[in-house]
Amino acid sequence: MNRLLRLRFKLKMKKPDFIRQEAHRHKRLGEKWRRPKGRHSKMRLKWKEKPPVVEIGYRSPKAVRGLHPSGLEDVLVYNVKDLEKLNPETQGARIASTVGKRKKIEIIIRARELGIRILNISEEKQEELLKLAEKQEAQEVNETNE
């Protein structure tokens, strides 16, 4: 698996940026890939000096296709219940963008208990959120005591 991940990384480094035909010439054309279909299209005919065309040979190995660079399968998580369905050895959690700060903190705490890696929040940011949660808890305790 690690060998295939390293191979995929090397292949991705070699892979050119596939841009739409004539995208450099007209501002109104975005760079998003569109297959050239014109009858006289030099790009479709794969002329040497024209930009490269998407081909199957640029594809990554099937075993690691679609995986996170760490080798874990990327699973979108909305709440703690979703998190408990994951296998920590093969899957990693990606917290959805619509999840708020309070629920995000709950998910981080539970993920640490279960040994699940969160893929879209760095360790530093997780620590920062947990410290913020502790600070808020201490503040709430002080308010209830007064």
Swiss-Prot record:
Q: Does the keyword Lipoprotein apply?
A: no
What GO molecular function annotations does the UniProt record carry, in alphabetical order? Answer: structural constituent of ribosome
Q: Which PROSITE patterns match?
A: RIBOSOMAL_L32E
Which superkingdom heads the taxonomic lineage of this protein's source?
Answer: Archaea
Cite the InterPro entries for this sequence: Ribosomal_eL32, Ribosomal_eL32_arc, Ribosomal_eL32_CS, Ribosomal_eL32_sf
Offer one Pfam family short name for this entry: Ribosomal_L32e
> Is the Ribonucleoprotein keyword given for this protein?
yes
Q: Which GO terms describe its biological process?
A: translation
Q: Which UniProt keywords apply?
A: Ribonucleoprotein, Ribosomal protein
Q: Name one GO cellular component term.
A: cytosolic large ribosomal subunit
Family matches, as PANTHER family: 60S RIBOSOMAL PROTEIN L32 AND DNA-DIRECTED RNA POLYMERASE II, SUBUNIT N, RIBOSOMAL PROTEIN L32
What HAMAP family does the database record attribute to this sequence? Answer: Ribosomal_eL32
NCBIfam families, per this entry?
PRK08562.1
Q: Which family does it belong to?
A: Belongs to the eukaryotic ribosomal protein eL32 family.
UniProt-recorded name of the protein: Large ribosomal subunit protein eL32
Give the organism, scientific name. Methanocaldococcus jannaschii (strain ATCC 43067 / DSM 2661 / JAL-1 / JCM 10045 / NBRC 100440)
